[in-house]
Amino acid sequence: MSVTSGRSKSLALVLLAATQFVVVLDAAIVNVALPSIGKALDFSRDDLSWVVNAYTLVFGGFLLLGGRLADLFGRRRMFMGGLVLFSLASLLGGLAQSSTWLIAARAAQGLGAAIVSPAALSLVMTTFAEGAERNRALGVWGAVAGSGGAAGVLLGGVLTQYLGWEWVLFVNVPIGLAAAALAPRLLIESREQDATRAFDLAGAFTVTGGLALLVYALVDANRVGWGSTETIVRLAIAAVLLGSFVVIETRAKRPLVPFSIFRLRTLRGANAVGLLIGMALFSMFFFISLYLQEVLGYSALKAGLAYLPLALTIIVSAGAASALVTRIGFKPTLIAGMVLIAVALVWFAQVSAGGTYLGDVLGPSLVVAVGLGFAFVPVTIAATTGVPAEESGLASGLINTAQQVGGALGLAILATVASGRTDKVISSGQHNPAVALTEGFQSAFLVGAGFAAVGAILAAVLISSRDSREHALAAQRGDEAAEAPSMAA
């Protein structure tokens, strides 16, 4: 079922995109507030990272389950329930009086976000017809998703400096509750037509536990060591759980994840590229923030403002990407985006300890923003092309999970690369910490560029050129059909 009024569709898209913006923003907004949070709640240095990790861990672990629940029990229903949970968790987090309290609230936020995000994307898919109309909608979606991380750093700096760290959490409450209240008016309920209340509990337990443990192992590997007993045991248990999930799903009468969806070649390729996008880009924001604050000496607010050109460029490039997908197809657009990301990260690798924002950061920020817009929009379209409406939540959960796991894996690898290079420079006799840190960042950016280059190759090899061409032709026909009545008038 879909909304037929153009105005209703536009309002629905605004609601869904704004909600996704908040979800993405929340993964980054606390970063610049961490020093203030640490002082206020007496966090240890190791525990402070869990303000971020608790959200990332639960979000990444539950995305696939959240998407499938939306298909089975109603996309609007799960969207609203996730928003209420997310908002209440944000309120509790802002009221936190201890480190344990805040970490628990952040985990609950992650759970709410894991329900909201795939439900919102699947509602976009069921509201907008495949083709030019959906491409435009996903252009808006890509713009807000891509700019959310940069906006989170900016907004986090402003709120922390002028209102206090609590407001990086309180800001979600009115937005989330307002969105939940508007949902019944603007969104039409939809779910799998033959869905029953029978639920694959074993599949849900194994895939959620496996993904959560995998993300946990990755985000904590840099602290405890890749070869440590803790990391090896966590990865082994995650592998056992995910392997068990595959066995369970092949035998279940009503599997949580019907593996028939993986027969779609383009979907498989898009998820592989989505993993590489996460590996290349999520850590980029982390290292740029460190460079701005620890090498260039920027305040949290100034570092946040430095992201403004990047965020604005993403919005423009995502809109351009949706039009380009309609004209030439999602495959060439995605390849171009991945190449631009690789070029930008190689450019970032030229930063110096005596650098400046204009000379070292602004140029590659604009290039990576164009690449990000050109990558996010087509990879989302490719990951959902040809997917039956009743499995749209599952497809949404898959691409979101690929990007989140990729982000955790990329950050774990690149943080290890950066710290290893920094330690080597210091041990060689370099006494200037800014020089040692910068050389570590340079190495991380180069490896990230390699991830993006591999993503471009995978897009060229794994994504169907025929699907891309057919999607573009169908979108063009849809545009022509939409223009015909207005020309006749």
Predicted segments with their positions:
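Small-residue-mediated transmembrane helix hinge/kink sites in multi-pass secondary transporters
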Residues: P35, G67-R68, G156-G157, V215, ...
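Transmembrane-helix bundle of Major Facilitator Superfamily
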Residues: M1-R185, G319-A321, I328, P332-L334, ...
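Intrinsic disorder in cytosolic terminal tails and internal cytosolic loops
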Residues: M1-S8, Q193-T196, L462-A489
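Structural signature of transmembrane alpha-helices in multi-pass secondary transporters
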Residues: V23, V52-Y55, F59, F86, ...
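C-terminal module of multi-pass small-molecule transporters
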Residues: G74-L83, Q97-W101, V116-A120, A129-V140, ...
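Hydrophobic residues within the alpha-helical transmembrane core of Major Facilitator Superfamily
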Residues: F21, L57, L91-L92, A107, ...
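Transmembrane core module of solute transporters
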Residues: L13-V58, G164, A202, G227-I237, ...
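C-terminal membrane-cytosol helix-exit motif in multi-pass small-molecule transporters
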Residues: L121, V173-E192, T208-D220, I237-A252, ...
